């Protein structure tokens, strides 16, 4: 990292990209647990439906990202498509995702492949999910089956996206109708936590058996728990089961994904809502681009020299100028972390596309808008701006 007359120059080889998740953009993920929940008359307000139709339009998505100047694309492959029934692996779906890997490489995009991003096959959920006997072994079996997809041309593999949030979801299911807290997160389900860590370790070994050259990690939802005066011990106790235990599990990994959006303030009585005068995004979260700097430093303090990759960071807003402002602030935090010697290897924005945000299409995180009726893609000014940074590797100096 160095400062030039033009601005802050990021290291050569820095990953500049955007991220997506299969269920949120592909459409018609009919064999997944989430599709079943969306159509079971529960609390999910809006089903995913066709999503952004990226299952058929992935080439267009990659064309745009490459044309905009990005060098990296993180996408997930869908377990429910690859193994729609126990032990039945679809050669057609495996070939589909291999075409995506090849398509990224042909366009000059380095593919980062996520093996699990929240959704599981319906049959896996119905047998008890992550806490059922043999769950980690079943995940390992699926990972082994992905060999034709990831064996060549894939440098980075993420085993599980935000396992801490999956454990929180497990606890919420246990609570049933009990209201969630107004700030912070419920205590994760420990059995789910333990199962996910075991699944990650088995998956890591399986990927390494496919190719020792693949760099393997997982990505954590960093909530940025900020201790208010006198609440340092309470904050550490609150953070550990919700975040730190998952970061600790990455100490022997090749890299760890840092995913950050906002902060949560902690008092001796627990988490408190954002300040009344805080700007809020379309998700209701506090606008707080500084969160990424805290997340990087907190993660580095736990994992030491394990490389950090920002695998998600962004903002849900209808005002694209705020997206540019937010991302500028976040990248300033990345540059400061690099200056301080942290091993930050990349920044992948969430999200490449406006997409399905787990019950609603209203929170627009995308650099590229998607027309709901025609699926027409339109890059926003933020996409052109961030792609330009990817081309130059320089974040311009702030102007007064």
Where are these regions (language model features)?
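Non-catalytic scaffold segments within catalytic domains of secreted glycoside hydrolases
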Residues: 1-62, 66-71, 80-400
């Amino acid at each position: 990292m160095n400062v030039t007359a033009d601005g802050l120059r990021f290291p050569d080889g820095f990953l500049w990209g955007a991220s997506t998740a299969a269920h949120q953009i592909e459409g018609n993920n009919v064999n997944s647990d989430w599709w079943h929940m969306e159509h079971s008359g529960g609390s999910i307000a809006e089903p995913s439906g066709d999503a952004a139709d990226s299952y058929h339009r992935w080439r267009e998505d990659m064309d745009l990202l490459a044309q905009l100047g990005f060098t990296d694309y993180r996408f997930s492959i869908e377990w429910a498509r690859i193994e729609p029934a126990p032990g039945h692996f679809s050669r057609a779906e495996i070939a589909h995702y291999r075409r995506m890997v090849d398509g990224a490489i042909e366009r000059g995009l380095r593919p980062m492949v996520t093996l699990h991003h929240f959704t599981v096959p319906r049959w896996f959920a119905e047998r008890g999910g992550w806490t059922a006997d043999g769950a980690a072994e079943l995940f390992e079996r699926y990972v082994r089956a992905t060999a034709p997809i990831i064996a060549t041309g894939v440098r980075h593999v993420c085993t599980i996206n935000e396992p801490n949030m999956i454990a929180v979801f497990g606890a919420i299911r246990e609570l049933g109708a009990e209201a969630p807290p107004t700030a912070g997160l419920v205590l994760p389900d420990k059995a789910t936590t333990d199962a996910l860590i075991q699944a990650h370790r088995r998956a890591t070994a399986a990927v390494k058996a496919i190719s020792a050259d693949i760099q393997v990690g997982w990505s954590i939802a960093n909530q940025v728990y900020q201790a208010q005066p006198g609440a340092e011990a309470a904050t550490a106790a609150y953070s550990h089961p919700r975040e730190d235990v998952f970061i600790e599990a990455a100490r022997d990994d090749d890299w760890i994904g840092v995913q950050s959006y906002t902060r949560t303030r902690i008092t001796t009585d627990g988490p408190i809502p954002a300040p009344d005068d805080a700007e809020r995004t379309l998700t209701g979260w506090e606008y707080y681009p500084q969160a990424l700097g805290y997340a990087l430093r907190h993660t580095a303090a736990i994992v030491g020299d394990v490389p950090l990759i920002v695998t998600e960071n962004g903002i849900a807003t209808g005002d694209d100028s705020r997206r540019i402002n937010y991302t500028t602030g976040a990248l300033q935090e990345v540059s400061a972390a690099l200056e301080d010697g942290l091993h930050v290897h990349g920044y992948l924005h969430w999200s490449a596309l406006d997409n399905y945000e787990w019950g609603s299409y209203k929170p627009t995180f995308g650099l590229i808008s998607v027309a709901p009726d025609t699926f027409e893609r339109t890059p926003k000014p933020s996409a052109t701006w961030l792609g330009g940074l990817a081309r130059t590797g320089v974040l311009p100096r702030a102007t007064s």
